[in-house]
Amino acid sequence: MVSSSLRLPSLTSLLFPATTRYPATLRRTVCLRNRPLSGFATAPSGTASPETKSSEVDRLRSDRAVTPRSQDFNAWYLDVIASAELADYGPVRGTMVIRPYGYAIWEAIQDYLNVKFKETGHSNMYFPQFIPYSFIEKEASHVEGFSPELALVTVGGGKELEEKLVVRPTSETIVNHMFTQWIHSYRDLPLMINQWANVTRWEMRTKPFIRTLEFLWQEGHTAHATPEEAEKEAKQMIEIYTRFAFEQTAIPVIPGRKSKLETFAGADITYTIEAMMGDRKALQAGTSHNLGQNFSRAFGTQFADENGERQHVWQTSWAVSTRFVGGIIMTHGDDTGLMLPPKIAPIQVVIVPIWKKDTEKTGVLSAASSVKEALQTAGVRVKLDDTDQRTPGWKFNFWEMKGIPLRIEIGPRDVSSNSVVVSRRDVPGKAGKVFGISMEPSTLVAYVKEKLDEIQTSLLEKALSFRDSNIVDVNSYAELKDAISSGKWARGPWSASDADEQRVKEETGATIRCFPFEQTQGTKTCLMTGNPAEEVAIFAKSY
């Protein structure tokens, strides 16, 4: 059994006290799934842009409405997760069930990163999730940092265990135990591995995808002969994460170095990518740690160098997790629901066929199938929604909620003109809808790919503009406090003490997110002490 002195309240009770209402979607889900739907509604002309009956539109919007972001960001976030069918609450408080669509986004993250890891010489493997407690105790700062979050197994097979087992919070300790058996000579180095796994941390305050008792991640671990190699590796991996964030998820993260107080327990240096969410809070989206020789000395992980002398290895570890899914939601989503960047979207295009008469159905579905085949052959991830249990208006709302980048509509008139209607998720209403796009395969494929690229670029540019407009340059503690109190990030010169950093946290609720790699040139004066400062730091409230 798992024992802990911590007892977690439910996710909903943490975010929604008894005096407040629960997210709209949590109340409506059962009604929505069981509600009989009316027949199809199309315009008299039978085109692919029907005007759904106003009463039906109102009902559909009511059923799948989300709390406006500006009204309650947390409620909006939970509404989107529920309505877009990304995740649900697990039976154990603080856990979540990742539903197929949410997991498909995680698979897209895995697919990209797996390729990059292997291109840079890393191999996948797997370590046990049960770790002897004595392993955790070997590295003093590590056990101190993780002790409050540990889940312990004390009974197995109905008997008290001789030694408590830790349910994996991270794997540096067990990795080093194995590295000591695999590394003997400099010829065994570098040793570079990665594992995709679940981890458990007994969190007090939870939020789906962002912070849960159990979550999925990848964690890389490497061992090197020199400190220079380890440092190069740590920076290489944070660069891979940075490119992934920008190029795949359209999230303009800021890469940098953590302060001493924010450094991973057991690391010499922690590098991070920090993302600004839609509520202007910071999200630590990925980290890469230069572990120095801290774990290798604790576990005796040594190798014989070229002169036959015994040396401790230099190590790194690095990870991203399913919180990236939460980051995508909170960066790009709007009051309609989820909005996915095309490169990370499990479905890039949804095709909605529309007909009014049975005599029109065969021709419309045949054309829709041909369009699907052409796009699939070209490598586009496409879904044909040909079910006749839902109205076109319902489908439009449903797929918009799920954030599909492009929608193709095909009706009888479009079949006659050999064309389709294309709607962009990121451009609402008529402005995002284009009529008369040819069904000719090469023409349609070229158009769709061009629009997907435009959407990817547009989402990044929008997020970048939002980020930059909400970072304030400050030169005094008073200015820092003003920036934080207004909900913005503060960027300013910093060379103050750990105690000063702790004071900022206690008085403003903000922490140093990072010392960005990109630094301004010239003489700087610490905003807190007035002493010379070599770097600027970014302060923000965070998840």
From Swiss-Prot:
Keyword Magnesium in record: no
Disruption outcome: Lethal. In heterozygous plants, aborted ovules.
Gene3D superfamilies membership: Anticodon-binding domain (3.40.50.800), Bira Bifunctional Protein, Domain 2 (3.30.930.10), C-terminal domain of ProRS (3.30.110.30)
E.C. no: 6.1.1.15
Catalytic activity: tRNA(Pro) + L-proline + ATP = L-prolyl-tRNA(Pro) + AMP + diphosphate
A Gene Ontology molecular function term of the record: ATP binding
First-level EC class: ligase
Positions of region (Disordered): 41-63
Ranges annotated as spanning the membrane: none
Superkingdom of origin: Eukaryota
Keyword rRNA processing: no
Listed GO CC annotations: chloroplast; chloroplast stroma; mitochondrion
Listed GO biological process terms: embryo sac development; plant ovule development; prolyl-tRNA aminoacylation; regulation of photosynthesis; seed development
Alphabetical UniProt keywords: Aminoacyl-tRNA synthetase, ATP-binding, Chloroplast, Ligase, Mitochondrion, Nucleotide-binding, Plastid, Transit peptide
SMART domains found in the cross-reference section: ProRS-C_1
Annotated family: Belongs to the class-II aminoacyl-tRNA synthetase family.
Protein name: Proline--tRNA ligase, chloroplastic/mitochondrial
Organism: Arabidopsis thaliana (Mouse-ear cress)
Origin organism lineage: Eukaryota, Viridiplantae, Streptophyta, Embryophyta, Tracheophyta
